[in-house]
A protein has these predicted regions:
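Non-catalytic accessory/interaction domains
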Residues: 1-179
């Protein structure tokens, strides 16, 4: 039986606005997910920018590619393909969404959505798609504002692991100083 491993779900859009959830795994499994689209609101009435969910769709992912017609053409800054954390998977981000997250992670209003983005970014470090130093800097910048102590604790542990195992030895001192 080939049943081990975790599915990776990631969004994909094309120039026509089509929105697809791509499943990457040795074994394709069914998943029930909520896909959430988020946008930066510069005029939130608070004097600072806030990233808010603007649309959400609950759907079944049952193949390598699942088109979500309800999300076609909706302008957004960030898409979470496992919004509300309904299924067990690794959640990927597009390069554009990852860059947005690196700049605005602390502005994401919903704490669960923020935690899901943190998890996705950590997996990107482990996969070699995000430099560990960038993750450490991100933790130093945004983790102190996290509202859940367990999230802060996990982020500090991950950033410490990144410094000890994933960065060049000559940067380890600077990395630990940031934390």
């Amino acid at each position: 039986l080939r049943t081990t491993g975790v599915s990776r779900l990631r969004p994909e859009t094309d120039s026509d606005g089509k929105f697809v959830v791509v499943q990457e795994s040795d074994v394709i499994r069914p998943h029930r997910v909520r896909v959430g689209l988020y946008k930066l609101d510069d005029d939130a009435g608070t004097g600072s920018a806030v990233v808010r969910r603007i649309h959400q769709v609950e759907t079944d992912i049952d193949g390598e590619r699942t088109e979500i017609p309800e999300l076609a053409g909706i302008e957004h800054d960030l898409a979470l393909v496992n919004d509300d954390d309904l299924t067990y998977c690794l959640m990927g981000l597009t390069p554009e969404h990852q860059q947005f997250a690196l700049e605005h992670l602390g502005d994401i209003e919903d704490s669960l959505a923020r935690t899901l983005v943190w998890s996705s970014l950590w997996e990107s470090v482990r996969d070699g798609q995000l430099p560990a130093r960038e993750f450490v800097r991100l933790v130093a910048r945004f983790a102190p504002a996290e509202t859940h102590p367990s999230v802060q604790e996990r982020l500090l542990a991950q950033a410490t692991q990144a410094v000890r195992q994933y960065v060049a030895p000559q940067w380890q001192g600077e990395g630990m100083d940031l934390l």
